[in-house]
Amino acid sequence: MNLFSTSIISNYWERFPVSLRLIIKARLWTAIGAGGVLYLSPIIFNSLGFTAEQIGSGITIAAFAGITSRFGTGYLLDKKFSYAKAIKAACLVAIVSDFILFYSQNYITYLCGQFFLGTAAGIYWPSAELAVPLNCNNEIKSSEGYSLARSADAIGVTLGVLLGTIGTYFEFARIIYLIDILCMLYIFHILLNNLGISKNEAKIETKDNIEFDIKNS
């Protein structure tokens, strides 16, 4: 028997709740977009003549923005703010960052782009991490949900860096920002149109399981 057959993979994937599958898809596409931006941006701005100090200061600003926005996002999530809305907000901020960095030719715009990039990450990560256990059910442990989510993150980053490397080979390294914009728009689209549907389907699945248990008891 082929352990990697399509049917086995499909059956494994369908074990997870509909809403969790949606979150996993969002994390995969986020990682694809972010992979190239995070790892290849220093190369782009180094080729423009930026010093190591200038590039490092941009990364520092991104980290500082990420820390402060994480605190703010965590506070709002503790106050029952919707993680889906937070992820959509992160997508919009990331798009702003991508536009700035795509057209950036000087140090000031580079710093602005890095600031928005860090802010987007700070909004996204607490929300994306919280979404995993909230969308697990009695049959799926949060540890299994996290393992799938982190696998999607790793695969996405790998694909993102690969696409960016191909773009660099063809002397169009800034394609990483266009890829990230497309990924963010797609994530925004699927969350906007499918999250409500997936929640309803999840409720139906839960209701069916309860009725099945009652009949068997």
Language model regions located:
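Helix-loop boundary and gating motifs at the non-cytosolic
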Residues: 5-63
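Cytoplasmic helix-loop-helix junction between adjacent transmembrane helices
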Residues: 115-153
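Symmetry-related core transmembrane helices of the 12-TM Major Facilitator Superfamily/SLC fold
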Residues: 175-192
